[in-house]
Amino acid sequence: MLNHFPGHCSNNIFCFPPIESETKSGKKASWIICVQVVQHNTIIPITDEMFSTDVKDAVAEIFTKFFVEEGTVRISKMTRITEGKNLGKKNATTVVHQAFKDALSKYNRHARQKRGAHTNRGMIPPMLVKYFNIIPKTFFEEETDPIVQRKRNGVRAVACQQGDGSILLYSRTEKEFLGLDNIKKELKQLYLFIDVRVYLDGELYLHRKPLQWIAGQANAKTDSSELHFYVFDCFWSDQLQMPSNKRQQLLTNIFKQKEDLTFIHQVENFSVKNEDEALRLKAQFIKEGYEGAIVRNVNGPYEPGYNNYHSAHLAKLKPLLDAEFILVDYTQGKKGKDLGAILWVCELPNKKRFVVTPKHLTYADRYALFQKLTPALFKKHLYGKELTVEYAELSPKTGIPLQARAVGFREPINVLEII
């Protein structure tokens, strides 16, 4: 859960990123909000388990630090959180979880107030998809049905209004789009009728145009004013726990405020009762020339993609691609259960390399293979072989297959027999 929040831990204290501004005298000022957990007058390490289970005799404390360059640090009084909220309910929070939610709310509120001077100008990274071609059963276990939307193969974009009334349109990686005046002009008109604090999350797209062309237009300072902005979600920085179905209702209300827009559109929602209905819609969308479908858990909160976090409340459905690539090396995973498990390294014709996860090997087999496969055995039996790889898409920047999984070798090879 810690990776849901921006910032880092140091000496058992979690600090959100500093919000910077400038004093009247031109000096740099920094405001930081922090959370710590105290048990028997001792600050203890913050763990992910604390977000689901309370720690006996522990309380959470929120405090802020403010300092001006060449000045002293001022520390606020502690705000103590001694119990969670909504106890006994499905959305109950622990002491620590509630403290982080309160701190994040204050952080976002302060960031918005200082956005003119803040380094990222109030940018919040958009929510990212965790599941690919899998719809979790939990999506259908709630009282309401999940919704399905068309998946466009465009460029992710988030829009918000700045303190001076200007429109900020930025990418998944928090890079500002400098052009797109046709879209910004309509957004400015729309924000005259809606809550100025709302963020609009969507995709820059023009139907049947290739992604490379769309990306080129999106990143140009002077574009051809052909791209459209398809909005599929909205959120408020201080209400990220708002469920998806409520956000969709509010998004519909937003678009009712001004219905004469040309370049901004609300994405259509389809309610489904089971996975088969979702798959039928995916097939329909593909026939229409779209990339596939997005499935949303209507009870899910908006979870920003801080530290590349991917939300378990979103699923993407699209056709798998496959191709043969030359195997040139092997390595292991870097963290968690993938550490010590073999990964294949393939090479593109342009000599760029990418890592591929074996699809049909168990973790036990992958551990054994990495331990016992020597460079000499690899060179003798596997180097230069063609490996069939399934992947979601090619990276528009590098051409490397994304979410690559090795199906098998073109010629029959049992890699476990090699060792």
Swiss-Prot record:
Keywords: ATP-binding, Cell cycle, Cell division, DNA damage, DNA recombination, DNA repair, DNA replication, Ligase, Metal-binding, Nucleotide-binding, Virion
Subcellular location: Virion
Lineage: Viruses, Varidnaviria, Bamfordvirae, Nucleocytoviricota, Pokkesviricetes
Catalytic reaction equation(s): ATP + (deoxyribonucleotide)n-3'-hydroxyl + 5'-phospho-(deoxyribonucleotide)m = (deoxyribonucleotide)n+m + AMP + diphosphate
Gene3D superfamilies: DNA ligase/mRNA capping enzyme (3.30.470.30)
Protein name as catalogued: DNA ligase
Biological processes per GO annotation: cell division; DNA recombination; DNA repair; DNA replication
Annotated binding of ATP, by residue: K151, E203, F232, I294, K316
Source organism per UniProt: African swine fever virus (isolate Tick/South Africa/Pretoriuskop Pr4/1996)
